[in-house]
Each structure stands twice: as structure tokens, then as C-alpha cells.
Amino acid sequence: FLKDQGYAVNESYLESNLQKLLARYRGEGWYNDAPAYDYYSAWAYQTYGPIWAEMFGKKQYPQYARQFMENQHDMVDNYPFLFSRDGRMNMWGRSICYRFAVTAPLSLYEYDKSGNVNYGWMRRIASSTLLQFLERPEFLEDGVPTMGFYGPFAPAVQIYSCRGSVYWCGKAFLSLLLPENSNYWSATENNGPWEKELEKGKVYNKFQPATNLLITNYPNCGGSEMRSWCHETVAKDWQKFRSTENYNKLAYHTEFPWMADGKNGEISMNYGTKNKKGEWEVLRLYTFKSFENGIYRRDAVLETDSCVKYQLADIPLPDG
């Protein structure tokens, strides 16, 4: 902004920061959140990057702007598939109280001139994710979005969050900056590939080799599922969220928002082992091995006892 207004800026420092941001890009539309993958790729990198490129970068730093826009284009073929057939978002990763901020990059596909974007599907996802929360009375408390997902939910809140953090939700309304006759606003809402391409009785996997992320779509129930990265010990998790349910589940499903694990073995979407202390300990130290023939393989080891090892093979099924 300052350079655009004619002020002198530290060029080398500015460019070094741009290079650091782009160095976080791993492929297929995903930036790494150091060390995990989560929605920061979408509501931060894939939101700020295209906006910066469009408003400033294309004129002042075209080579960097081009990279941000190419990275945005890579996202088209997988990120929208993370949402359910009805357009609901998945409860996955940190800062989930930002909720429908996950839709921020969808309207910014307006900057994508490839002709490969289904703008009606993008807006369908955005409007449905808004309704996913606005139609629930527990979403608001004293007129302010609660700290949680559908309602207040402490296990999903991080140490850096406060009551004002929820206003990141407002990023969803960046779409209002687009003109009324834009592709995003003029297209008719639709369900994209859920309408005809994703057939019932089948399961559809989108594996991304650059990140080892697996997005699975289930036409029978209309749900979508994410398998992602987690390899963080509780002992060294100074941030107190990298090793938790926000990341350590075997998978995250749009139809089954995760629940907090209980001390008496109440565990969802994970395996629990009673450790030497007599405590139920879930898996969190996963190592990706392969994805072949529809089988997603990981090894896992118990944090408190490295002799306890698992070889995991996930086979997504139409009703499983």
C-alpha cells in the first residue's frame, strides 16, 4: 500500500517476506501451516495472496503475483470437494471458531481467468456454509458468535483466541467487494459435480501427493471426509492444540463433527490404548506410508510407549 502511494519501502525485506510466504506452498492448492495442514491455507494464504496480487502485485511485482494466482488455480480441483453435497464445511483443524471464513477464497476465484471455475457451485458452498451456522440458535450468545463450532465448545478453542477472534468469520463477506455483474454473483447456484458426476453407490477419493491429504466424497450420504497430517507429542506441544482432537483424528467427516475425548475411554474417530499410567491414550503420532488401490496407509506409534505400534489401512467404502 505504501509503495503504491509513492512512499519508499524496504524492497529487499518486502521481497524476502513474499518468498517466505510462497515457500510455504506445497502443491495442489495447499500451503503448509508449519507443520500441519488446516484452513489457514484457505482463509489466510489463499485469501490474502490473490487479493494482494490483484490489487497491487500484478503491477509492482508481477512474478510473485503470478505465483500466487497459479497457486490459487491449483486449489479449484480439490478444496471445494472438502464441503458436503449440501455445502456444509468440515470441522477440522485449529481456529474453527472462524467458521464460514473458510468460504473466503471461493469468491476470489473471480480473479481466475482460466474458465475452469464453476462459480455457481462456489456460491452455493458459501451460502450453505453461512446457513449451516446462522440457522442454529446456539451460534450466537449476546449477539456475538460463540467460541466453538455450532455453539460454545472449549476443546476447539486455542490459547491465542479471544471473544473477538470469531470476527474472522467476516472474511466470508469479502465477496461483497465484487461487482454485481461478476461471474460469482451472476451465476446460478448449483451443486457442481454432486449433481451428476458423483454417483451413488460409489466413493470418490482425491489424493494429493504433494501433501498426502486425502479428501473422500460419499454420494450415498452426501458427506465429505478429510484425512490429514498429525505427528505431535503432547509433551512437546507448547501451543496445546497441535496434538489434540483438532488434528489427531483418523479422519474428519462433514456429517459427524468431532467430539472431545473423555478420560474414561469415550473416544471418537481414533484408537485408544490404556497406557502404563492407566490412562486412555489416543494415537497422534502418524506417519503416512502410501495411497494405492483406494487404500490409505499410515503407521502410528503410542507417544508414551514406542513399543506399541499400529499399521493402519483405511479403505473408504460407499456407506463407510
Give the positions of each predicted feature.
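Extracellular polysaccharide-recognition and catalytic grooves
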Residues: 1-191
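Extended polysaccharide-engagement surfaces of secreted carbohydrate-active enzymes
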Residues: 110-320
